[in-house]
Amino acid sequence: LSLEVKGLYAGYNGSLVVQGIDAIFSKGRVNIILGPNGSGKSTLLKTMAKVLQPKVGTIRLFNKDLQNLSLKEIAKLIAYLPQRSNSVPRMTVFETILLGRKPYFTFGPGNRDLEIVNSIIEELKLKGFENKFVDELSGGELQKVLLARCLAQTPKVLLLDEPINHLDPKNQIEILEVIKKTTYRVNLITLLVLHDLNLALRYGDELFFMKDGKLLWKGFASELTSEVIEMVFEVEGELAEFSNQRLFIISSYTTPSEKRFPKAL
């Protein structure tokens, strides 16, 4: 059971940002998408969340075409967290997380909805924040609340676009730990966009590298080579091991004219 993208082209107006993507994202794994700015990572996630319609190609979840599913069905299956926005409605933490249960409401929230929200508040260590307004929270606290809202949907797929952007190292680690543990515990299909290679190596099971709208490399984190990183990001360096953790150490910058890039997958 998986999320499968086949021959996908997507973009805005007449511009194609994602070009010919073929990929399978499996359950129970943290799948991390990496690539330079403007490589199509966010557009890919938006298309998989059905925020953006594909120009060509298909997206199938558990062998069902997303195009044939209603928005309510999508909301029960897929939770999508876009890049951080400065405009957050003035609601309490509890109300914000409860919004994740809205696809399941009949005549407002029931006992089951409240139980799920309270459980997630405990899990993400947000106890004591329930009655605070979200616009009064720190960046790390707000990201936890927005992640909690996604988890409240009890989705099968979690799509997170740069969920640790602008956060300090402690909050980055806390949020990534929650994502990884929840993915394994609930057997989620998790996709997240990251820019930090070393955090991707630490938390990713499978990595997907994009450049210029195309998928250039995919594989397990343990299979990644420095040549792939150099090809995608145009920086030279080495993969080293420290305390059982693989790290990429940059040695120099490579201009595009100095490298020859292979074709996309």
Predicted regions and their residues:
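Conserved ABC ATPase signature
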Residues: 133-137, 141
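Catalytic Walker B motif of ABC-type/P-loop ATPase nucleotide-binding domains
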Residues: 158-162
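The feature captures the beta-strand-to-loop junction immediately N-terminal to the Walker
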Residues: 34-36
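Helix-to-loop junction immediately C-terminal to a conserved catalytic motif
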Residues: 49
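Conserved ABC transporter NBD signature motif
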Residues: 57-65
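ABC ATPase nucleotide-binding domains
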Residues: 222, 226, 232-265
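Conserved ABC ATPase "signature" region
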Residues: 112-129, 154
